[in-house]
From Swiss-Prot:
PANTHER family in UniProt: PROTEIN SPINSTER (PTHR23505:SF79), SPINSTER (PTHR23505)
Topological category with respect to the lipid bilayer: Multi-pass membrane protein
GO biological process: lipid transport
Glycosylation sites: 75, 98
Superkingdom, natural source: Eukaryota
Keywords, comma-separated and alphabetical: Glycoprotein, Lipid transport, Membrane, Mitochondrion, Mitochondrion inner membrane, Transmembrane, Transmembrane helix, Transport
UniProt organism field: Arabidopsis thaliana (Mouse-ear cress)
InterPro entries: MFS, MFS_dom, MFS_spinster-like, MFS_trans_sf
Keyword Membrane: yes
Name listed for the protein in its UniProt record: Probable sphingolipid transporter spinster homolog 3
């Protein structure tokens, strides 16, 4: 059940809150939370505004990496010849390793493996692991630039995902906790604006560096840019999320904490039976939290719509420049897609957060914005790919992207506010896992398979874009049946799943 955020805020003079559940944290997570809260008070800390800026820059660099590897300058193409015998040289990663479109799509999705595995771990354990994760990211990106075989670059991309997971599950809950009440959606919009902006910047960056130097230099440059933030991850004070004080006072786990000369030591019983018991409690606690999330109907429907949405956006971000180059013979596809995406991404994402704040940020209003913006965006994007005129395509596609990107703040607002504060990091982690494992992880290889089969980028993009209508339909169901989600009729969730399954089945035969 959704609780009002005001009801979840603990009184100033109290140490506990009636909305925080200690059962939602596992013993191992509690232990690390205690460690985080016991850091010496003199350790350096940053204001929420500065942390928002840092998170935005890190997010920007993460998605710039995705845009760079998708750019024609870095991704490249295989050697091809036309009917007249005129051949084009092999370029970029695809040309260097002679990859098919399917293998190229696998390269796009491989980093998600690390992200999916590591996100719940980072969400449950140490708040200080941001520094470790960003260090892994930096080393992995260096490895991408130094790759000597296809399997090696795929492995490095997996570790890039591990690095990204270090902050992605913690950043949004922290921003929501610390943003002014009337600007929560706007702050989230600013953070998620970095997703399309980063991808667009990656298109331009990768296209320029790949063309003038080598695709390898694009990765090495990213590592240099991220290195200072990896160091900062070790130096800044650990994040403290809502519910931390409750854990501090009520869940010591019989740990004796001592602070001597600015050093923190934890003494715990090390017997095998105690360790096994702690691990067992960790897994049972995690299972209980997952059961709570699964029963939260708003969360389930929101994520189902987000999965469909991300399936399209993930494939757009990777195949967009190549599709545009082949359909409209764009000479500067990286620059054009980059410019359109960065402008529409910034304006659309910020507008979505601003509009949600203006109409009052609530879950019903968020669902209205999600379904309406996604449907109209799908109409414009679908129509754009039917046009033969390059300028007509750019105009309509820009309008479509503007509307589609307006969903970033609302969809994450729902993820954060449909559960109690203590479950927000896990909610964001599971949402991230779901939208990737069912969304953009399979979409890039599947689009590659479709393109290899029908050999028409226009038809491929039209098939892909049509899935946005499914996302709009799911979010619309969430809006019109919101009251039913909070009723005791458990069969309603089954009805929703059957509707989505039938819709997907019918779509497969349309």
């Amino acid at each position: 059940m959704v609780t009002k955020e005001e009801d979840c805020l603990p009184p100033v003079t109290e140490t506990t809150s009636r909305c925080y559940s200690t059962s939602s944290s596992t013993p191992l997570a509690e232990l690390e939370t205690v460690r985080s809260l016991e850091i010496v008070e003199s350790s350096s800390s940053l204001s929420p505004v500065w942390l928002l800026v840092i998170f935005c820059i890190i997010n920007l660099l993460n998605y710039m990496d995705r845009g760079a590897i998708a750019s024609n300058g870095v991704n490249g193409s295989t050697r091809s010849c036309n009917d007249k015998g005129k051949c084009t040289l092999a370029t970029g990663i695809q040309g260097h390793f002679n990859l098919s479109n399917f293998e190229d799509g696998v390269l796009s999705s491989s980093f998600m493996v690390g992200l999916l595995i590591a996100s719940p771990i980072f969400a449950s354990l140490a708040k200080r692991l941001i520094g470790v994760g960003l260090t892994v990211w930096t080393i992995a990106v260096l490895g991408c630039g130094s790759s000597f075989a296809f399997w090696f670059i795929v492995l490095c991309r997996m570790f890039v995902g591990v690095g990204e997971a270090s902050f992605i599950s913690l950043a949004a809950p922290f921003i929501d906790d610390n943003a002014p009440q009337e600007q929560k959606a706007a702050w989230l919009g600013l953070f998620y604006m970095c997703i399309p902006s980063g991808v667009a910047l990656g298109y331009v960056y990768g296209g320029y560096v790949g063309k003038h130097f080598s695709w390898r230099y694009a990765f090495w440059g990213e590592a240099v840019l991220m290195a200072p933030f990896a160091v900062l991850g070790f130096l800044m004070k650990p994040l403290q999320l809502k519910g931390s004080e409750t854990l501090k006072n009520n869940n010591r786990l019989q740990v004796d904490n001592e602070i001597e000369h600015d050093q923190f030591e934890v003494s715990i019983e090390t017997s095998k039976s105690s360790y096994a018991n702690a691990v067992f409690k960790s897994f049972t606690g995690f299972a209980k939290d997952m059961k709570v999330l699964y029963k939260e109907k708003v969360f389930v429907v929101n994520v189902l719509g987000y999965v469909s949405y991300n399936f399209v956006i993930g494939a757009y971000s990777y195949w967009g420049p190549k599709a545009g180059y082949n359909i409209y013979k764009m000479k500067n596809a990286d620059m054009i897609f980059g410019a359109v995406t960065i402008i529409c991404g910034i304006v659309g994402t910020l507008s979505g957060g601003f509009i949600l704040d203006r109409v009052t940020a609530t879950i019903p209003n968020a669902f209205k914005l999600l379904s309406g913006a996604t449907f109209l965006g799908a109409v414009f994007c679908f129509t754009a790919f039917t046009l033969k005129s390059l300028y007509g395509f750019i105009a309509l596609f820009a309008l479509g992207e503007l509307l589609v990107f307006a969903t970033q703040a609302p969809v994450n607002y729902v993820c954060l506010h449909c559960v109690k504060p203590s479950l927000r990091p896990l909610s964001m982690a599971i949402s991230t896992v779901a939208i990737h494992i069912f969304g953009d992880v399979p979409s890039s290889p599947l689009v590659g398979i479709v393109q290899d089969h029908i050999n028409s980028w226009r038809k491929t993009t039209l098939i892909l874009t049509s899935i946005l209508f499914l996302a709009a339909a799911i979010w619309f169901i969430g809006k019109i049946n919101l009251n039913s989600f909070y009723s005791n009729d458990e069969s309603f969730l089954v009805q929703i799943k059957l509707f989505v399954a039938n819709l997907c089945f019918c779509k497969g035969y349309s």
